[in-house]
Amino acid sequence: MSEGDADGGGREIWIEKYRPQTLDDIVGHESITERLKQYIAQNDLPHLLFAGPAGVGKTTAATAIAKEVYGDDWRENFLELNASDQRGIDVVRDRIKSFARASFGGYDHRIIFLDEADALTSDAQSALRRTMEQFSDNTRFILSCNYSSQIIDPIQSRCAVFRFSPLGDAAVDEQIRIIADTEGIELTDDGVDALVYAADGDMRKAINGLQAAAVMGGTVDEEAVYTITSTARPEEIREMVTEAMDGDFTAARSQLETLLTDVGIAGGDIIDQLHRSVWEFDLEEREAVQLMERIGEADYRITAGASEQLQLEALLAALARGNET
């Protein structure tokens, strides 16, 4: 990497620098983008609901729609709000209504993009539904959420619903290599594999991880990636679980302590990695089901506010105890 790039591309954020500008540029969701392009071509854009995990292209798709519909005027006709930052009924009543009432450039409608709409309260969603009805002649709403089940049915019934799945490994791999080549970064194959694993289908996380590792200077390899992303290596997760299932709780607990304290991995992230690793173990189906149940119980309790370390230790203890008989 050149000296001028040593601070990560002149401090430019790569997720913005390499954000797809058109629907055709979006990778991994071709069936969705084709339907969206048909709506635009027919000048028949409905209200839209994009559901799916973070970093899979929901915001990018909404922005690309605005750019294709309005061209250079897209900023004046596109309002983006983040419901998790601006919760409550006032968002719906004030900002959305004032934008929906205005017009710019003689277009048939404007677009309001409400990100993380599942963070809105039930009252706010009900108000949003009424606003959607009131301004349906000149405004199109695009809502994004992680979980469509958190969106009230009256809103879902007014939208065309698109479900964005996590991106495939090949799509993330390809994009990471393109960015590394463009930025002049020396990126090893095991570094790519580590970024793909750490991202788990989240392109934003993969690109952020690449930039963070590149800022450190030198070659971006798996060691740099796992360190900068605070991700456990797959073999470390396997070793910890194998030790527990072999009845060596002390060794498994020591490995857990290393991951939590020395490496600095959050308990919730360890749970996610455990869940991803279940089928990599040589387990009978009954054993795999039991392990999945224990992971689910620990995840539920951690989400409810219980101690991450205590719940993970209890999970390992249950595995060790279950294999003593």
Swiss-Prot record:
Example GO molecular function: DNA binding
Pfam family, one: AAA
Gene Ontology biological process terms, A to Z: DNA repair; DNA-templated DNA replication
Recorded GO CC terms: DNA replication factor C complex
Record InterPro entries: AAA+_ATPase, ATPase_AAA_core, DNA_pol3_clamp-load_cplx_C, DNA_Rep/Repair_Clamp_Loader, P-loop_NTPase, Rep_factor-C_ssu_arc, Rep_factorC_C, RFC_lid
Binding site residues for ATP: 52-59
Keyword annotations from UniProtKB, A to Z: ATP-binding, DNA replication, Nucleotide-binding
HAMAP family: RfcS (MF_01509)
Recorded family membership: Belongs to the activator 1 small subunits family. RfcS subfamily.
Function: Part of the RFC clamp loader complex which loads the PCNA sliding clamp onto DNA.
Oligomer and partners: Heteromultimer composed of small subunits (RfcS) and large subunits (RfcL).
Protein name (database record): Replication factor C small subunit
Organism annotation: Natronomonas pharaonis (strain ATCC 35678 / DSM 2160 / CIP 103997 / JCM 8858 / NBRC 14720 / NCIMB 2260 / Gabara) (Halobacterium pharaonis)
